[in-house]
């Protein structure tokens, strides 16, 4: 399937570990930790970061464009480029859906764009989360209250 999608390529890394300093976060020393499933390099000199996702039938358009899902690849790209000193213009990101129940086309690869604006937005979300963690600001998700054992008790946060 990779040959069909990418043509001629070489495997650059498998299960690459990222432990990169988050330079955008100044309140504390923090590293971004991630594991990239596969990085290939195509004959045009581009790197392709691929993240495997298991599913039953595939993803609808809403899930394919969900920020919190696609930002994972955006941040992988940012920190991969930081680690290897690679120009982000030479890196593309993709999800590879491994469909358990599909009879045909049980692997689907699709590109996720990660330009400068999206990278900035993903980084901002990451930094804001780290600020809240550092300051011990716990955001309450009221949608989860009904199932909580502390719902409407004095221990309710």
Predicted feature residues:
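Catalytic cores of nuclease domains that cleave nucleic-acid phosphodiester backbones
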Residues: 1-59, 85-92
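Non-catalytic, well-ordered alpha-helical scaffold segments
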Residues: 33, 71-74, 143-146
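Short small-residue beta-strand/loop micro-motif enriched in glycine and branched aliphatics
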Residues: 57-61, 104-107
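Short alpha-helix boundary/capping segments
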Residues: 61-69
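Short acidic-hydrophobic sequence patches enriched in Asp/Glu that either
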Residues: 68, 72, 118-121
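Metal-dependent nuclease catalytic regions and adjoining charged, substrate-binding loops involved
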Residues: 78-157
């Amino acid at each position: 399937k990779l040959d069909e999608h990418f043509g001629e390529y070489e495997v650059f890394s498998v299960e690459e570990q990222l432990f990169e300093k988050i330079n955008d976060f100044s309140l504390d020393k923090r590293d971004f930790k991630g594991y990239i499933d596969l990085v290939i390099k195509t004959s045009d000199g581009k790197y392709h970061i691929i993240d495997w996702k298991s599913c039953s039938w595939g993803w609808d358009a809403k899930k394919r464009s969900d920020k919190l899902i696609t930002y994972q690849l955006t941040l992988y790209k940012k920190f991969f480029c930081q680690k290897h000193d690679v120009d982000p213009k030479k890196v593309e990101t993709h999800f590879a859906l491994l469909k358990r129940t599909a009879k045909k086309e049980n692997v689907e690869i699709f590109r996720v764009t990660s330009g400068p604006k999206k990278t900035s937005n993903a980084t901002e979300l990451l930094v804001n989360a780290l600020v809240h963690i550092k300051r011990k600001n716990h955001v309450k998700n009221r949608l989860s209250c009904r199932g909580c054992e502390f719902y409407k008790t004095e221990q309710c946060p």
